[in-house]
Amino acid sequence: MTLSNFPTTISHLPNNVTEVLQNLLYGIQEAIGENLVGIYLRGSLALGDFDPKTSDIDFLVVINDTITEEKFANLSVFHSQLASFPNQYALDLEGAYIDLDALKRYRAGEIHPTIYRGGGLQWGEHRINWVLERWTVREHGITLIGPDPKKLIEPISVEELYSAVLVRLRDWVDYANQLDDPTWRLPLSHKAYVVETMCRVMFTLDCGDICSKPHAILWALETFPEPWRSLVERSQSWRIDNVTSPDVNIISEVMRFVHWVASKAGLSKQ
């Protein structure tokens, strides 16, 4: 596949995004060879709200069999080389390599070769959010190479989406109870991420669907009562602020928002 025949759904992307995707495709095919089944885009690229300023490039690679240590080493070298590529998105990749059997349905405790934004390839345990990732790929994933993802991933029910979201929401409640966690003092962009994530949680629980962050924000602005509507609105000015540290009032407000979402979801305050 070349830049000229990328799916039309991503043909509008900036050249530096498609350039990274082209290098990603070539490198994966070279490293994996005949074990490759398919390569799919997920996340904001799949859901149609990719933001060149803040979004990362989420991908999923499907393989016939579990990656061998030799193939893992080859992929690690490739990803290290790609990370040094003179392109702003070369460090904005998040993806995983999952074999056909494991991909069909999420099973807790499994580990797969995974790369996170700004990091290298590692063997990582996939948590319950990979129910949501599978759903996104199955229902909206963009196929770069390979069969329709619906042929590879079993249907995921609304009840399974609810269960996965509630598990993640409990994790967020635990986090909101930890005022001494240093990550609460990260720049305002982090607080925007928390607010956006809570909006997505509420959207899924209310609508039985998964949407992008921008879509969830618009929905929340039309749906949430005060003071939370105003918080959601203000948070959008924080999205690209990677410098300003939040004051304690903002941190407290965002924490209360997490607890409000949890209460609406039927989770008792912890």
Specify the residue positions occupied by each region the protein language model found:
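Helical scaffold of the NTase/Pol beta-like nucleotidyltransferase catalytic core
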Residues: M1-Y40, K71-F72, Q270
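Structured mid-to-C-terminal alpha-helical surface segments
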Residues: D209-Q270
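Amphipathic alpha-helix face/heptad-repeat signature
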Residues: V17, A164-R168, V194, I250-E253, ...
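Catalytic metal-binding acidic patch
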Residues: L41-V77, D92-Y97
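Extended, well-ordered alpha-helical segments in internal regulatory regions
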Residues: C199-C207
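Glycine- and acidic
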Residues: L3-S11, V61, I240-T244
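Conserved NTP/Mg2+-binding pocket subregion across the NTase superfamily
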Residues: T2-I10, V77-L188, A192-V195, V201
